[in-house]
């Protein structure tokens, strides 16, 4: 999930890190879809080596999208996932590795957050279903129109959790998908593909980071590998910085707020379930042929360049006159660590640090002021120096009281402005709004009479008569609004607002008033603030959490069992004496098994994904762990406005009690359930042209059961071990499609094998530093001393990945195409929206015309109706431009001169006009062929040139 609002804050503070993706769309010819050839150079002017997919960020929007109707069944969900991966692949076009990672069993520290999310999702889903049924009954009772309710099972997104049948089926589908692409897509032919499905323990993004860390530790690793990671979580940014790779890019879908969402009752856009009135759907198109079209556009992708973010951070964190050598890599690690205080997936954020209030900037300023006293950096390769952190936190604690007061002042000021705004709107709005056919509308609005009603007044009158005749409940004093809904003939009386402001949630802590610390501990922890021992325990747990999270980001999971046992965080002023606290963790811990994790994170409403005897433990009143599964629970808004921002007060799961209860039901598992309950590993795939393919086939021929080292020279330096896969995909064996609508692979040439990353000792420390031989990318940001050192040269900003990329130019054929397809103006032969090419146009992409003018009609034949060249010229070409008084006739066109001197060539199938044979823009205030006055030029003629001869 990451840190809420972190990406928005980051992209606003450091805008140059964002680059829009250039995406080549598939083409369609005669009804046949032509896929994108990903083997061609990347249109983004950059070549990526490795692409990593955090698959859960793909699975969720494909299975239950928010901006379009959901897939009808599981098969459609799988196809949607395949298409989404194809889009990403065609944008990034990796040349070495594709790594797909699905969330497996998470550490215990993450399970608390997963448990909260799933309980919330179940509760909100049940409430939404009840509300939907209530509104449906009300609408039908009033005679409203609703489409028949489909009898289908509601998709429970909680099934996207390791151990469920859905995730097991997804792994099978992805195996088929990879084999299909390796067989048929030229962009995949030399690619190494690794799939880490839900059976492999660990979160998806951390499995990716663990792979990168272990490969970087190998002596033959390429330090200039260009990585691209796909995911929308904000913590991916910090994980990417933690790798210290010079070439690291994140691709994510661009967030666009206020996307239209269809109503769950009538499937129409523009309102929610609570506002649904059951009105008939407006016909789209003459014959309703556009009924299935959606008003939402396909999402766009953006690149986030971490190398540019590193430049920003280097500028911001650079400090002079330090008592120790400045190291930008260490300072970036400290910045990542400070971001943990404003929130992460494992710890609640400190009450005084809100990212929307500039908490990170405040921490950085305090860090730069205090670092001279600390004597060094806060972190080193994932380990925290608590003595130095204590100095930072106590400095934050000194300003906590002023932070709370300023927050209250800002909130009060915002409420006053909103109240004044509502008063102005109420004062400016008329109390009486006319309606009906003659309703006045603003000019140019979509609902104006000229756009809808007046376009066919007879049809509107007919519909009104039919509506009145067929609806006895509608009185004669009723008219119809532009959307077809009945409204009083005289108009609509606007309802007075019930209140000037929304009710504010009750806040018993009141952090802005004296005594805030005592009230906080009493309300949140139910203890007295004077209980120093308890406060020390809370701070100790939070400090352990900070150390655990940093080590998780830089070294891997320090303990699978540790978790923060409270719902709330302490204050920064409570961090006194943390230098003496221990930050060691129990070694040798193991992750939960998949079904055990389901029991720890699922509510009873999602028990259908568990074996029968297991789910009984969730609902049986006599169950020893029934208290883990409350049917309802409180949500503490904790000073926030919306429920999703609040804290779900769920009981923590006691691991010992849970395991003891499960021991009694373990014998009830079937062989299939036992298989799904086991932990798995990664699988590597290659195609027939990959150098590693023959080596893998030899392993299957020998039947060796011992792990074999991967030859790095055959797969771009990747190291690890191979072991035979019991469910292997092998050549000359049919790969059956798990999706009925997709074909089987009868001539398979791909091969798969189990893969394991290089192993290290438990106390091994991965160095958080840039590798020797790594080359930093060219600087993107404008140097601070540019004005002094540039000798008057103008700074040229870099808009994409390549500073030397050529600007986009259109050749003469493209301009002619625009001239043909652009709507024409009225009254004269002009293209109203076509800009003239510049007279000195010399595009880098210029190419001379094909030999023989007879080829031009063939070239344009796919853009014009058939045989359009044989008929008389269109009206806009029959019009003759008026020549200036005394002007001489034009000389004939000289191809040789044109080819030598011009990037544009006259088109003999069009009239002569401006440069390149293009007519000028229409100008009603001027006459003459080039916009000159009709009485002729007022200045001497220009000298003759080889390009045009006007005489």
From Swiss-Prot:
One of the GO biological process terms: neuron differentiation
GO annotation, cellular component aspect: aggresome; nucleolus; nucleoplasm
EC number: 3.1.13.-
Residue stretches of biased makeup (Polar residues): 445-458, 467-485
Region (Disordered): 408-508, 907-951
Domain of life: Eukaryota
Enzyme class: hydrolase
Compartment list: Nucleus, Nucleolus
Keywords linked to the UniProt accession: Acetylation, DNA-binding, Exonuclease, Hydrolase, Metal-binding, Methylation, mRNA processing, Nuclease, Nucleus, Phosphoprotein, Transcription, Transcription regulation, Transcription termination, Zinc, Zinc-finger
MF-aspect GO terms: 5'-3' exonuclease activity; 5'-3' RNA exonuclease activity; identical protein binding; transcription termination site sequence-specific DNA binding; zinc ion binding
Record PTM Phosphoserine, positions in chain: 448, 471, 473, 475, 482, 487, 499, 501, 678
Positions carrying Omega-N-methylarginine: 824, 847, 851, 883, 895, 947
InterPro entries: 5_3_exoribonuclease (IPR027073), Xrn1_helical (IPR041412), Xrn1_N (IPR004859), Xrn2/3/4 (IPR017151)
Modification Asymmetric dimethylarginine, positions: 824, 847, 851, 880, 883, 947
Function in brief: Possesses 5'->3' exoribonuclease activity. May promote the termination of transcription by RNA polymerase II. During transcription termination, cleavage at the polyadenylation site liberates a 5' fragment which is subsequently processed to form the mature mRNA and a 3' fragment which remains attached to the elongating polymerase. The processive degradation of this 3' fragment by this protein may promote termination of transcription. Binds to RNA polymerase II (RNAp II) transcription termination R-loops formed by G-rich pause sites.
Subunit architecture: Interacts with POLR2A and SMN1/SMN2. Interacts with CDKN2AIP and NKRF. Interacts with CDKN2AIPNL; the interaction is direct. Interacts with TRIM71 (via NHL repeats) in an RNA-dependent manner. Interacts with DHX34; the interaction is RNA-independent.
Name listed for the protein in its UniProt record: 5'-3' exoribonuclease 2
Originating species: Mus musculus
